[in-house]
Amino acid sequence: MHLGWWKDEVEPFAAQWETLSRAAGAKKTAFLLGDFNSEADVRGEGYDLVLCSGWQDTYRLAQQRDEGYTVMQAIDGWRDAPDAAAKKRIDQIWCSQAIAVKSTRVVFDGLQEPQVSDHAGVLIEL
């Protein structure tokens, strides 16, 4: 999935999240994953909204984890941000309930696997 930015005037994150979480929330165990366009370390925006909605960040649940950054440099859509060159964890895997997660790691970041996009992927092992 690919969500909009928190302050997007046309398709704001909060409205997209409300629709998405309502559709996925009826499932016993559901996973939502992809580009959330919401930095995990920025408070009061998309990441916190998802967390406060009762969803679990599998990165935080994992027994083993790497740094988790899926964006390593300035990319389209973020180039004008004051911290454009900073590493970001905007691609996430969320679960509708707390589960046991053995590990999480970034993949296709150009280090262990070829880079295939301006974002790296995320892989979890349950």
Segments predicted by a language model, with ranges:
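Active-site regions of metal-assisted phosphoester/phosphodiester hydrolases
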Residues: 1-126
